Amino acid sequence: MSFKDLRSFIDHLEANGELKRISYPVDPHLEMTEIADRVLRAKGPALLFENPKDHHMPVLVNLFGTPKRVAMALGKDDPLALREVGELLAFLKEPEPPRGFKDAIAKIPMFKQALNMPPKTVRNPPCQQVIKTGDEVDLTQLPIQHCWPGDVAPLVTWGLTITKGPRKSRQNLGIYRQQLLGKNKLIMRWLSHRGGALDFADFKQQFPGERYPVVVALGADPVTILGAVTPVPDSMSEYAFAGLLRGERTEVCKALSCDLEVPATSEIILEGYIDPEELAEEGPYGDHTGYYNETDKFPVFTVTHITHRKDAIYHSTYTGRPPDEPAMLGVALNEVFVPILRKQYPEIVDFYLPPEGCSYRMAVISIRKQYPGHAKRVMMGAWSFLRQFMYTKFIVIVDEDVNCRDWQDVIWAITTRMDPKRDTVMIENTPIDYLDFASPVAGLGSKMGLDATNKWEGETNREWGTPIVMDPKVKQKIDSIWDELGIDDSPTL
């Protein structure tokens, strides 16, 4: 099942008990965050606040608050099915020629999907049913959440920022938080390595002093939103990838003030520009780390047009100490990364980004070890292969007999298969998230790799321990007589 817009997905979630409407007048200032946080931690439904206090526009939160809902957004029943998305991405990153007739036949579905990429331009789009310009532009009329007591101002969190570099044929979609600065101004917090910031830097170099056109889409269809947070190959647009996932082309329309294309069924569109000379102090804000971050200067986005659907819905979220919605997205996208990593490193058995690690700061990888030093090769490869992992501070490598998603297993491997000096890799002066205040320098810090695999000859001179395992025949016998023993419940082993 595919969803043409956010509303059809909302209806689907509600029909399946995955969305709750709240008619009580809840304040976007702090109250929505407290409610959303309690519900998310209880693995509860998405929430639609129909009557936000002092506003007339409903607010949707916790849309992707469970891995199940992320899978549902892509028409899947189980988060494990998201590995199909990873297989598609692995194919697109490095398509291999067919090895023969049978292989060519097997690859036909992927080739057919790849031909269905270009977005489809439509006229009279829903996102432009209502048009506001000039003095009508007033961002304070939107029910923008003020998430935490120490936040400096309300914050736009789920906007898809659409940019285009002067030397690029494709647009970029990225999600960057935006601080409300005034009736028609937001602060665009994009870090220097992100797609939007790179496009802006190229534009400034080629057209110094000129205004840079930018568009922000709020409440796009769920597949396009997820396309913007997926590791799409640099040569492919997020619109094209969303079309692949959806099975039909993404509908777009031209913005009113520039040539950028926007998702046609979006709830709200903000159009405007960035003056390269206008910067403002952004923050502090509570972030996905569970702390308030430092302030810094970022470009100011001046909004010249607001267009939206009739009876528009404002899509929002909050970030805080895990679990939060970004952490749940990370758990779901974990399944996407597995096939991509396996294509480059077939010896990888499984890969896990624990949500407690703030979505990406720690990774655990299980491998089929084949030679001394193998674990170190894999950890180096993981750090360098995908841009998404350059901020991963800790990587733990375990053998295939260890469940890398079970902390009891992982800690057992670390404490029994590691010598701290021999099996720890430290790398200094590497890229680190600017939000990581634990690093000695903003944006630059160290990484640690932990080799918790069994050690081979060459890695140790000692006789290595053999794990204790019960005789399978004894286990089968005890299983067969368990009920006769009078012990209440058989523990899961």
Swiss-Prot record:
Main location: membrane
GO molecular function, one term: metal ion binding
Described function: Catalyzes the decarboxylation of 3-octaprenyl-4-hydroxy benzoate to 2-octaprenylphenol, an intermediate step in ubiquinone biosynthesis.
Pathway membership: Cofactor biosynthesis; ubiquinone biosynthesis
Record-level GO BP terms: ubiquinone biosynthetic process
Membrane topology: Peripheral membrane protein
Catalytic reaction annotation: a 4-hydroxy-3-(all-trans-polyprenyl)benzoate + H(+) = a 2-(all-trans-polyprenyl)phenol + CO2
Pfam families assigned to the protein according to its UniProt record, in alphabetical order: UbiD, UbiD_C, UbiD_N
Gene name of the encoded protein: ubiD
Positions with a binding annotation for Mn(2+): 172, 238
The protein's name in its UniProt record: 3-octaprenyl-4-hydroxybenzoate carboxy-lyase
Positions annotated as active site in the UniProt record: 287
Gene Ontology CC terms: cytosol; plasma membrane
